[in-house]
Amino acid sequence: MQRRFILKLAATLGAASLFAAATVAHAEDTIKVGVTGGPHAQIMEVVKTVAAKNGLNIRIIEFSDYVQPNAALASGDLDANSYQHDPYLQAQVKDRGYKLIRIADTVTYPMGIYSKKVKTLAELQPGAKIAVPNDPTNGGRALLLLQKQGLLKLRPDAGLKATPLDIVDNPKKLKIVELDAAQIPRSLNDVDAAAINTNFAMEAGLKPKQDAIAIEDPKGPYVNIIAIREADKNKPWVAKLVAAYHSPEVKQFVESKFGGSVITAW
């Protein structure tokens, strides 16, 4: 009787141990990845499918702005995010003290200038309102694009984080309107033109190759990335996540789905 009890207890404890081990293994193989809506979210759905074949489960968390995904990653609410370019990450690390690092390049979204009021930049009238993102890196990116198009000039040392205060020549006296990047597509009726990040443009139904009246050179510093906490860089799931993103399936999806508006960077 006692022997049967001991054997039964041992079996129960063994099963419990196996269950606990399985639970831990499952937890280690499931990660939460933050994205913004539009192409980033669509691409991550394909990454999720590929990763699952290699034992990595991805839970996608979608955000509607640029600030929260890094805050959530730094606080431990996410394991990774995929929505930003490296200059933005570096600015956030410097300004907020986040211990976040870049682990892989993903895609490039050339920024475009859009308008519902003019068909070319040459048609912009003196005093025209131009909307640009209000965060330092994307705002600077927009101003550099406007400079490239000959609409204004910036101080030579303004760099990637240029602000309207760095404008030294503005022949048409353009009025720069700084808005949250995600909200700019909604402002097109209220401004004469707007510099819009491609992910937000596409989410709003705009087609960069067809609708932009000017577009950024894709061979710039604004390659999008996957970011993680520095402390997690040696965890096994990191390599699995990168391999899934850099898979032929994802590359084919990007090329067929976005028709050159989004460009793979690996």
Q: In which residue ranges do the predicted regions lie?
A:
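Short, well-ordered beta-strand elements
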Residues: E28-G38, L56-E62, K129-I130
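Beta->alpha turn/N-cap motifs
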Residues: G38, E62-Y66, G76, N81-Q90, ...
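Short helix-initiation/N-cap motifs at beta->coil->alpha
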Residues: I60-A71, A158-R186
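Pocket-flanking alpha-helical
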Residues: Y66-G97, G112-Y114, K119, G139-A142, ...
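Ligand-binding "clamshell"
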Residues: A91-I103, K116-V118, D190, A195, ...
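A conserved helix-loop-strand patch within extracytoplasmic ligand-binding domains
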Residues: I103-L152
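Periplasmic-binding protein-like
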Residues: D105-Y114, N138-Q147, M202-W266
